[in-house]
A protein has these predicted regions:
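Acidic Ser/Thr/Pro-rich low-complexity disordered segments
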Residues: 313-328
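WD40 beta-propeller repeat fold
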Residues: 21-215, 223-242, 246-259, 271-290, ...
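Leucine-biased recognition of intrinsically disordered, low-complexity hydrophobic segments
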Residues: 10, 17-19
Length: 377
């Protein structure tokens, strides 16, 4: 069982204490590797089990099956607690649509299957053929975070984005899909946002051709769309359970964009800044749960970069045409560190322990890292 009272102290041995002392010599945040474990599978997703010191790995061993593993963080090591294998490889997962009491995980695999998992029994409670081909990305809302009903959104190579209610399994409750005769674009990333009340919820989706689309689930129509010129590897709102504030879009060609989503100009749309990062593909951005203005980006060169956003004195100005336009602040690179020669495919902050995170690289490793001094930012 995944109970918070069973958690072990994160740092108990002398070597870990010495490590903490070594990085305390400056006030600058440091990225410290706490645990590094080689695996016999390629890891596509890493997720902390809510309110525990356990995490889930999703991936595929050499025989191309799907593997779900549960690890326990115990002092200076991680221990495999349970695993289950399925015929097809897993690609993505989320706890976003579950309650803290149930802690059920939604997963997507390489053949388009969406499943909800009871991790205590390692059994599926829901299995749906959600897409015709691989589910690249998934997110959840209405469970741990966000007002309203629990929902899961999936994006696929078939060009479709589907929103699912786990209580209604026969069909999606909302969809974005290519029109007849329209080119099918590969959806690489999805994220919920603006879920601050039962009358407000959005889904953002990024595609391989640079399209970013935001669907208003309450109104049932497109809220906004743009193109960022490069394939969109990741999209994430700084918080999914507040009025939409900032949206980070990570792309190929070593760049990400940060949009201010509070003010939309009728001609220019939402204002944004463009930032170079990693000297490689920027796979994802993950905002710190304890501070929404701090976020980590993951690189195709095996690196992590820690950023902080600072707001401008005024977030909007009035243009000569009378319309308001958003004003961007600045981003600051706080720290960076290289861990591998292969991409960092997944990264997840721990909600309960500030600075603790788990990450998976395509070199068949999982790492637990600690970012220090975040409380001083």
């Amino acid at each position: 069982q995944c109970r918070s009272e069973n958690r072990q102290p994160l740092f108990t041995n002398k070597s870990s204490l010495r490590l903490q002392i070594m990085v305390d010599v400056t006030d600058k945040p440091q990225i410290v590797e706490h645990v590094n474990k080689s695996l016999s599978m390629t890891v596509y997703e890493t997720k902390w089990i809510p309110s525990s010191a356990r995490f889930v790995l999703l991936g595929s061993p050499a025989r191309q099956t799907g593997m779900l593993q549960i690890y326990q963080l115990n002092a200076g090591s991680i221990e495999l607690e349970a695993e289950v294998e399925r015929p097809k490889s897993f690609k993505c997962g989320t706890f976003g649509a579950t309650s803290l009491a149930e802690r059920r995980m939604a997963t997507g695999d390489f053949v388009g299957t969406l499943a909800m998992w009871d991790l205590e029994r390692l059994k599926e409670t829901m299995v749906v053929k959600a897409h015709d081909t691989i589910i690249n990305c998934i997110d959840g809302c209405g469970g741990l975070k966000g007002a309203g009903a629990p929902e899961v959104v999936t994006g696929s190579r078939d060009g479709c984005v589907h929103v699912w209610d786990p209580r209604q399994q026969d069909r999606p409750v909302a969809s974005m899909q290519p029109q007849a005769g329209e080119a099918v674009r590969d959806c690489w990333s999805v994220a919920f946002g603006d879920a601050h009340s039962t009358a407000s919820r959005l889904v953002a989706a990024g595609y391989d051709n640079g399209d970013v689309k935001v669907l208003d689930l309450v109104a049932g129509k497109m809220r906004w769309e743009t193109n960022v010129s490069n394939g969109v590897c990741g999209v994430e709102f700084d918080r999914k359970d507040i009025e939409m504030n900032k949206l980070v879009v990570t792309t190929l060609e070593s760049r990400y964009r940060l949009y201010d989503m509070r003010t939309e100009h009728p001609v220019h749309g939402f204002s944004f800044l463009s930032q170079e990062a990693h000297q490689s593909t920027v796979w994802a951005a993950r905002h710190l749960p304890q501070n929404r203005d701090v976020f980590m980006t993951t690189g195709g060169n095996g690196s992590l970069e820690l950023w902080r956003y600072s707001y401008p004195q005024a977030r909007k100005i009035k243009e000569k045409d009378g319309h308001e336009k958003g004003v961007l602040g600045t981003v600051e690179l706080l720290q960076k560190k290289n861990f591998s020669t292969q991409p960092v495919a997944s990264f997840d902050w721990n909600v309960d322990k500030e600075g603790l995170a788990v990450m998976g690289c395509l070199d068949q490793t999982v790492r637990v890292i600690v970012c220090t001094k975040l409380h001083k930012l």
